[in-house]
From Swiss-Prot:
Protein's name according to its UniProt entry: Thiosulfate sulfurtransferase
Lineage: Bacteria, Pseudomonadati, Pseudomonadota, Gammaproteobacteria, Pseudomonadales
Residues that bind substrate: 235
Coiled coil start-end: none
Source organism per UniProt: Azotobacter vinelandii
UniProt gene name: rhdA
GO cellular component terms, A-Z: cytoplasm
Classification via PROSITE patterns: RHODANESE_1 (PS00380), RHODANESE_2 (PS00683), RHODANESE_3 (PS50206)
Catalytic reactions of this protein: thiosulfate + hydrogen cyanide = thiocyanate + sulfite + 2 H(+)
Gene3D superfamilies reported in the protein's UniProt record: Rhodanese-like domain
EC number: 2.8.1.1
Active-site residues, Swiss-Prot/TrEMBL: 230 (cysteine persulfide intermediate)
Length: 271
């Protein structure tokens, strides 16, 4: 029986430690090269978070080309029957973005380690400095559009009653007081709930337990299509992950995010 079949999308350190030797597991570390070298969860393979992005201005958060993803997932030993567990050390931004990429490649079996390395260390669980054996060369992938909202898609949906735009940036960015593009402000109709507000620092950066109710208060509800973004779809990786974990049926990441929207001459903006 699949060791992971009974688990929810968001799992706890004890769940992972009990399954570290599962043959189907691909454990992905999205911390930093220095942090990984210092010690990582046993068996984890390091992925430089920047490899999950296109990396080209003005919208570095756009999806990398298929060839780059095929190389990346080949290095991880990707196979359809695999179960991914993903973690970072910042509360879930990079890990959530990686989960978005798993949706893009059509991988349906994955989990997020709640609180990531922070929660693992808080429980004094084991670390390793060993490097996993190389997994192989590039794999053939089919990419799916459904997890992603393009700029044109979002422009066509603005004002729809069944749309909620979740802006994961800071309130200062949302209000146009801190400007990181040609234009400041936010996408018309967007609701601001900063990604860090979804974390519980008293519980080692785990997702706060009252998050469903908080989103309900903001009108970010399961009956709507959720499109979430930040500046580069890094911070909004966490908010994408949270909506998925809550079972929201229609969730998209706007990969271009404010880097694209705020630098495009024809996009509407609210302050």
């Amino acid at each position: 029986m699949d060791d992971f079949a009974s688990l929810p999308l968001v799992i706890e350190p004890a769940d992972l430690q009990a399954r570290l030797s599962a043959p189907e597991l691909i454990l992905v570390d999205l911390t930093s090269a220095a942090r990984y070298a210092e010690g990582h969860i046993p068996g984890a393979r390091f992925v430089d978070p920047k490899r999950t992005q296109l990396g080209q201005p003005p919208a570095p958060g756009l999806q990398p080309p298929r060839e780059q993803l095929e190389s990346l997932f080949g290095e991880l030993g990707h196979r359809p029957e695999a179960v991914y567990v993903v973690y970072d050390d910042e509360g879930g931004g990079w890990a959530g973005r990686f989960i978005w990429l798993l949706d893009v490649i059509g991988q349906q079996r994955y989990h997020y380690l709640n609180g990531g390395l922070t929660a693992w260390l808080a429980e004094d669980r084991p670390l390793s400095r060993e490097l996993p054996a190389p997994a192989g060369g590039p794999v053939a992938l089919s990419l799916h559009d459904e997890p992603t909202a393009s700029r044109d898609y979002l422009l066509g949906r603005l004002g729809a009653a069944d749309l909620a735009i979740w802006d994961a940036r800071s309130p200062q960015e949302y209000r146009g007081e801190k400007v990181l593009a040609a234009k400041g402000g936010h996408i018309p109709g967007a609701v601001n709930f900063e990604w860090t507000a979804a974390m519980d620092p008293s519980r080692a950066l785990r997702i706060r337990t009252d998050i469903a109710g908080r989103l309900e208060e903001l009108g970010i509800t399961p009956d709507k299509e959720i499109v979430t973004h930040c500046q580069t779809h890094h911070r909004s990786g966490l908010t994408y992950l949270i909506a998925k974990a809550l079972g929201y049926p229609r969730v998209k990441g706007y990969a271009g995010s404010w880097g694209e929207w705020g630098n495009h001459p024809d996009t509407p903006v609210e302050l």
